[in-house]
Amino acid sequence: MSILSLVGLGISKKFITENAIDTLNNSDIIIFDKYTSRSCDINVDVLRRLVKGGKTLIEADRSLLENNSKIIMDYLDKNYNVSIASIGDVLIATTHVSLLIEAKQRGHNVKVIPGISVHCYLISKSLLSSYKFGKSVTVTFPYNDFIDPTPYNVIKDNKERGLHTILYLDLKSEKAMTANEALQILLRLEDKHRKNVLSKSDIVIVGARLGCDDEKIVALTVEEATLYDFGNTPHIIIIPGNLHYMEADAIKWMLMS
């Protein structure tokens, strides 16, 4: 029986675990998930340097991992050990669990190597209570004139319950959405729906290039954030809900310039 391993790489090179590296080195084929998330410094070249020679390394897009699992299963059926390596944690904000199930149904062994995800890292760095986060959501690029209202509605639902919202930002091919673009999209949704979900004076927390030496985590108003230079992507946003006084003090003294 072959082994299918799902390997979380963490959010940057310094968070890649020995367990992750050992698992990759014990694989014949490594499939690098390049579409689910993006790191400030992990890419396919970094993976090549991390693992021993002789490995087949494949860069995978959404089509391979979500629509062409037969390719992966064929490798396993031919007794190749396969690892799927993802930025962050391999099962947070992914659909890869379906691959584990399919491999197990075919009689193969499966293994999961967790990694430090941007979700957990951001919550810690934001100084907000982990108990007060609601559903997370992705802000997507507009398609023609259509703007998906899902993030607006999720923020609304979370705020009604006093909960914070983490906003993941869209990736399209090689373009990553910036925090500035995401907030401008949300303001356009507010102008359209007018449910008082977001105003220019609201405080938001923005993370940029988390896990790298040049990371930024700042709290500022929506209006300020639309103009702020957060530097290179990836970016991520928290829309706070009701703040406990300790959370408010932490934002004021630790995150606001």
Curated annotation (Swiss-Prot):
S-adenosyl-L-methionine binds at residues 11, 89, 92, 117-118, 169, 210, 235. It comes from the Archaea. Its EC number is 2.1.1.98. CDD domains: DHP5_DphB (cd11647). The keyword Methyltransferase applies. InterPro entries: 4pyrrol_Mease (IPR000878), 4pyrrol_Methylase_sf (IPR035996), 4pyrrole_Mease_sub1 (IPR014777), 4pyrrole_Mease_sub2 (IPR014776), Dphthn_synthase (IPR004551). Pathway: Protein modification; peptidyl-diphthamide biosynthesis. Gene3D superfamilies: Cobalt-precorrin-4 Transmethylase, Domain 1, Methyltransferase, Cobalt-precorrin-4 Transmethylase, Domain 2. It is an enzyme of class 2 (transferase). S-adenosyl-L-methionine-dependent methyltransferase that catalyzes the trimethylation of the amino group of the modified target histidine residue in translation elongation factor 2 (EF-2), to form an intermediate called diphthine. The three successive methylation reactions represent the second step of diphthamide biosynthesis. Belongs to the diphthine synthase family. HAMAP family: Diphthine_synth (MF_01084). PANTHER family: DIPHTHINE METHYL ESTER SYNTHASE, DIPHTHINE SYNTHASE. Homodimer. This is Diphthine synthase. The lineage of its organism: Archaea, Thermoproteota, Thermoprotei, Sulfolobales, Sulfolobaceae. The gene is dphB.
